[in-house]
Amino acid sequence: MTSKFKFFTDRKHFFLGVIVGLSIVLALGIGQVFANPYNYKVVKVSDGDTVQFEAPFMQQYLGLKPVLALRVLGVDTPEKGGRAQCPQEDAKAQAASAFTKDAVAKAKVIQFEIKDHDKFGGRVLGDVIIDGQRLSELLIKNGYARAYFGEKKQSWCN
């Protein structure tokens, strides 16, 4: 007997179809889930431009851990630790992290504006709105970040 759905009889194509289908469903559903801006509790400031927050919908809708990391879109902050190119960059990264931690700690209202997902996976891209001010703008204004939109990054080792 010949199947109408011959494409799905091959195991590889079947799983590909399932993945594509789930991707479409998630893409359509995430627009509903990520209505902007959202108020969630900050769990951790990873570095100057990455903040982790409680995201209960991750577990409720997707069955994933309820914490999501947001990288601030449109900025480049220095790298810290082993990713720093020089001691000066690491020091600047520590200062950027301290600035973000302090801003979050003093905030009365923190909102997350989610725009996209990170190409490296596991994070979303957007902005953190702290008492009505965008973290991206605060980081740049106070010298802890540079505007960045995909061009070649400038060195922090000057």
Predicted regions and their residues:
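Small beta-barrel nucleic-acid-binding modules, primarily SNase/OB-fold domains
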Residues: 2-158
